Amino acid sequence: MKKFNLLLFFLLVVVVFGSQGTLIFKGTDQYNLFLGRNLIDGRTLFIANTAIPEGFASLQVEQPTVKTAAVTNTFLRVTPQFLIHNFEPFKQKGWLQSVVPLYLRYRYDTLKPWLVLGFESEVSDNITGFINLDIPKDYRSYISHGDNFDSKPYMNFPVELFEGKLEALDMSWPTFGYVSYASNNFYASLGRYKVAWGPMRNGLTISDASSYYDNISSSYTTPLWKNGRFTYSFLVITPTSLLNEEEWVKQGKVWDLNQRRPYTEGAKTIIGHRFDVQFSTWGRLGVGELNVVGGKHPDLNDANPFIIFHNTYGEDFSNVMASLDLSLVPFKGIELYGEIAIDDVSFGSTEAGARGKPTALAYGGGLRYAMDIKGTLLLASVELYHTDTWMYNRWQPLLTFTNRIYTKSELPGSRDFTDYPLGFKYGSDLNGFSIMANAIMTNGLSISFVYEHFKQGEVTLKTPYLNMEEPEDDPGEFTAPEDWSGPVGETVNANILKLNMMIPYRNFTFGSDFSLYFGDYFKKNGGYEKPIFEIRPYLSYVF
């Protein structure tokens, strides 16, 4: 009966959407229910990528898909959210620069949009289209407290409109939308949404830390051996290729010993290939490869869906990373998993020399536990992380493993770049761990707790690669082999605690989140001597 209650709730969530093309995203209650149910049954997922289509999800849980009629459902969601916090205004202006600390951007990304107009189209049993017009609060009015840094925000609605300031109406939307086709064995989508690779909650190769990725994704899956599956995935991401004047100068220089000439077209493309081998219902191995092509538009040599590179030998315009991850379910309800991302390994003639690229790895592992308590799903995990000193970095701005997003603000006026790390959410040169617990009840009540801690050295993604300001420079500080693993220099500690609660009732959703930040990391990146907190209760209604 316990499993039946959990299964019933899971099916109710899925049936709302119907089409096999509807996508499920990591970190949502729907995904956690999907993941938890499989762990309770002693199964690992045959694909560790998200978004995952419901066609694949129905295959994973061995449930038939639901036939649907072609229809478009329109909704209008209004969400007033109130803000109680002791954050100081962030006063450093950015004009085509990445100056805002990542924790402040992540804080903004989780703020509810005050108005969402959505069109969800079930085109057929296999095709879903989703158009989402989400209007958020102006970015800088939230983190910088208005034009004069003295208008402390108290809600997500642009109250400055009542003062006649039409510029308070943020126009940096939308952040979500897609069209997707899926069956039980094939999936393809085009859109703007969160993407993630691997089993870790905070991924090291591609994480869902970015507010979105503009991407094309595709996968196919087939039975393998007696109880396994083989799944192949192809991905193309196109971050903004906007650079500021200083970055264009760096992009136009020859840095690499193997580089023949600079490539300076306004283009950056991230191409990913990955296969997952589920060798048994209790085990899965994933192998992936990412190729960042920058300064030129990719051709079929760069973006062939079925050619996987160790090295493109395109040092002028290419940066390649490999990944390996493993998931094991030795007992029902327990999952052991790990991931390693390999940017560079310094050995042999291709990497040797004083100005060769250093070894740069990111690796981590975790333990996940799921159980059903009288119809309530409890999902908990502990994860450990390490990123090397120069991970995700590169001389040429268009070859870093980052997803740049451009945000336009008017209160105060700013044109901000946010360079989200493609992998671990806080970047390079650190050790960290996290604890997560999520309880989801049959009435829809969801409570989650997350604690994250990391110790970071002096090298970040804003640090010039190998501390070289010019190509003729010798590598600077923290570039000797003994410094490659990090953290290096003067380290700082960060502690982030988050508590979220949400319960739906008919067309209403009631919820709140609480965040607490403390540690000398926030003194270095914000000047905070004492802990900082934020409480954000909200009420959402769907028309």
Where are the language model's segments positioned?
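Positively charged n-region of N-terminal signal peptides that target proteins for export
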Residues: 1-4
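Hydrophobic h-region of N-terminal signal peptides that target proteins for export
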Residues: 10-18
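Cleaved targeting-peptide boundary
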Residues: 19-27
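Outer-membrane beta-barrel channel domains
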Residues: 26-284, 352-361, 365, 376-383, ...
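Flexible, solvent-exposed loop segments that connect beta-strands
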Residues: 149-161, 468-487, 522-527
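Signature for the C-terminal beta-barrel architecture of outer-membrane proteins
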Residues: 195-196, 213-415, 419, 428-435, ...
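C-terminal structured domain segments
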Residues: 492-523
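Outer-membrane beta-barrel "beta-signal"
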Residues: 503-506, 530-543
